[in-house]
């Protein structure tokens, strides 16, 4: 029982900013603090890359607290994402008058980046790629990831695009990125059930151990509180990632990109400051696909044939 009380106390301590046990209230709080964060950026209280001031906002302060406790659960190697099991694609809008595009045309160039991207402002040469599990037999003329890449470009009828596969450069394969999709295919009920199963197992083992010591007339050892740390941290990280995905990662209208994307760009600066090489995030416009943004555009390169697509 002491071990269980320790677990409950530790759970409350880790949830001191957001009460993760009350989902509806937490969702409202995240939406509210995110809106405040965005408004502060829109009012130029600090720049997107001014982390010292940004960390005084409630949203980023909480994000930092949660991140410091469980960042290892979000870490993935670039080679784990850009591998043979995943189909990785980039789409580039081209003009009808252009000559046949080459690999260089598929790479980001500052002079061509005139609008905000989700995690970077104009002229920043970060590499955005779409990916999904590789399909042996695509159901249509375009694979899932190709459709995702075109959706991310907001392709409309009459436009022309080049599509090309990408793969990781070997020297970057072990670099770490932060995966914000860890709870994408998991429900809140499943996240909670896993926590309860893990803590129940620990409690049973601790109780069994105490009974054995009692029967042997020995003084039972102090309950190992540390055993609860991993399941609790895992629960918080999955719950928080799920809340972010459901409440924050939403489609953005092109008319207000600079305002709506500013807090994401600040988050990216935070993750970059921690030494990571990119971010994995779910597509808000094509749920079957995912995206990765790499802070060094040379971390991956085009490969294979370039396909030209006319949007009808």
Where are these regions (language model features)?
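Active-site and NAD+-binding cores of ADP-ribose-processing enzymes
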Residues: 1-121, 133, 156-312
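A short, exposed loop/beta-hairpin motif centered on an aromatic-Gly-Thr core
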Residues: 122-143
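Conserved structured core elements
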Residues: 143-147, 261
């Amino acid at each position: 029982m002491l071990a269980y009380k320790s677990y409950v106390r530790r759970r409350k301590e880790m949830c001191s900013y957001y009460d993760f046990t009350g989902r509806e209230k937490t969702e409202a709080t995240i939406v509210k603090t995110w809106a405040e964060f965005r408004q502060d950026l829109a009012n130029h209280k600090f720049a997107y890359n001014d982390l010292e001031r940004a960390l005084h906002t409630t949203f980023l302060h909480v994000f930092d607290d949660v991140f410091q406790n469980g960042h290892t659960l979000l870490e993935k190697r670039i080679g784990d994402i850009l591998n043979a099991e995943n189909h990785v694609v980039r789409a580039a809008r081209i003009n009808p008058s252009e000559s046949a595009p080459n690999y260089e045309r598929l790479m980001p160039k500052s002079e061509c980046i005139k609008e905000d991207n989700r995690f970077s402002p104009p002229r920043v040469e970060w590499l955005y790629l779409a990916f999904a599990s590789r399909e042996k037999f695509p159901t249509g003329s375009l694979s899932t990831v190709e459709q995702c890449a075109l959706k991310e470009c907001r392709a409309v009828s009459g436009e022309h695009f080049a599509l090309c596969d990408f793969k990781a450069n070997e020297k970057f394969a072990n670099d770490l990125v932060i995966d914000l999709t860890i709870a994408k295919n998991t429900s809140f009920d499943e996240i909670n059930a896993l926590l309860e199963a893990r803590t129940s197992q620990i409690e049973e083992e601790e109780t069994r151990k105490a009974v054995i010591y009692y029967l042997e007339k020995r003084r039972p050892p102090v309950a190992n509180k540390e055993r609860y740390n991993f399941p609790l941290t895992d629960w918080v990280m999955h719950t928080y990632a799920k809340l972010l995905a459901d409440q924050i990662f939403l489609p953005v209208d092109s008319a207000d990109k600079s305002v709506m994307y500013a807090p994401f760009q600040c988050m990216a600066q935070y993750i970059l400051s921690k030494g990571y090489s990119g971010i994995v995030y779910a597509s808000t416009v094509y749920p079957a696909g995912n995206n990765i943004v790499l802070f060094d555009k040379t971390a991956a390169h085009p490969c294979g044939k370039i396909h030209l697509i006319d949007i009808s």
